[in-house]
Structures are given as structure tokens and as C-alpha cells.
Amino acid sequence: MERETVGSRGDLYLPAETEENKMRKKSHLSLAAYLIGELESEQLDRHKKAFYLGSILPDLTPKMITSPHEFQTSYRELQEKICDLISYVQSGEGKERVVWRRLGVVMHYLADYFTFPHNTVFDGSLKDHCLYERDMKHAMRTYIHTGDARMIFEAQRMRKGQITNVSELFAYIEKTHKTYLGAVHDVKDDCRWIVEMCSWALIGLVNIICKADEKLQPLQWMYA
């Protein structure tokens, strides 16, 4: 079980942040807010603070400096995190708060994979990377309130062939990321890629988790 370092008053101790990290955090928090609103899950509403924390937690660890969240270098780690999450649920001892925090972590990695500077095809400088992250912060905050973003989640929700196991999820991530690498990249397009991927992945993971533990309440529309 993952643990954070806390003080006597329950304060979360986090490493000092760079301006780049602050910009990344705001983009991830905007995405998390969108997913919370669209999923319409009472359980997530109860544990949304944990989901928000998970969505920024990977950027708040020293490991981020030496192991940036790039598909080529961290995808295997993400797969392990997802498999560990399912095992945690299957153990029957999983806590809802921890499950939603870990789901937030998964969303963080997926969002980074579909952010241009986090891929080997990006050949810009560190300054270019920071400027892209700055623009992404503003673009994501705006995009999640558009009709296009709302339509994406609804389309994913109604889509046939919902993901039912981790093999299907991994296949989808890998295929979609390969397509993404061959596409034109800009901030607006990245926002759409991220929203599409995270919407489909979150719906799929909730499907898998609810089937792994029948005590968990499925979403009202999940098996409609």
C-alpha cells in the first residue's frame, strides 16, 4: 500500500517544486476535475480529494527528476501499477480512497504520454518544453469546459466493446499512442488526445475494478 509522508498535523510533505512542475500540476488538476464531473460516480465524489492527489502525485516525487514520464521509459512501470491496483482490489482489503488515488496516478501517466514534449519525437530545448507546458496549462483549463470535451466522454461512455480486462486496456493504449506519434502535434490537439485516452481508460478501469470486486458499486450506466 502506498504511503505519503505526513507531519503531526496531517500535513503532506512534498519536495520543493519548480515552475515547470507547478504548470504541469495545474494541467493535471484540470483534467482530474473534468473526469470527476463526467464520470458521475458517487464513490468518486466521496474520494475526489484522493483522485486529485493521485493526479499530481507522480510529479511530487524526487524520482521525477531522474525518470521523467515518457512512454518509452515508464510504460512498463505504468503497466505494473495497473496490475498492482487490480490485485489490490481483488485482495478484498482494498480501501476506496486508495483505489481512487491510484486511478488518479494512472491518469497522470496517460496524460503525459499524450503531451508532445514527453515523447522522443520532441526535439525542442528545455525552454521549449517549459513553454509548451505553460500553454498546455491554459489550453486544458479552457478545453475541458467545451462542448467538444463533453461530447468525447459521452461518446466513450456509449461506445461498444467496452474494455473488460487489462490486456485490452494495454492494447488500446499502445495502439493509440503509436497513432499519436504519427500525428501533427500542438497544444490543442494534445488536449483532445488526452481527454479521449483518459476518458476511455478510466471507464475501462472502473469496469475492470467493479468486476474484480463485486462489493464495489458499478456506475449506473455501466452495464446498460
Residue ranges: model-predicted function:
Residues 2-105, 110-224:
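N-terminal leader/auxiliary helical segments
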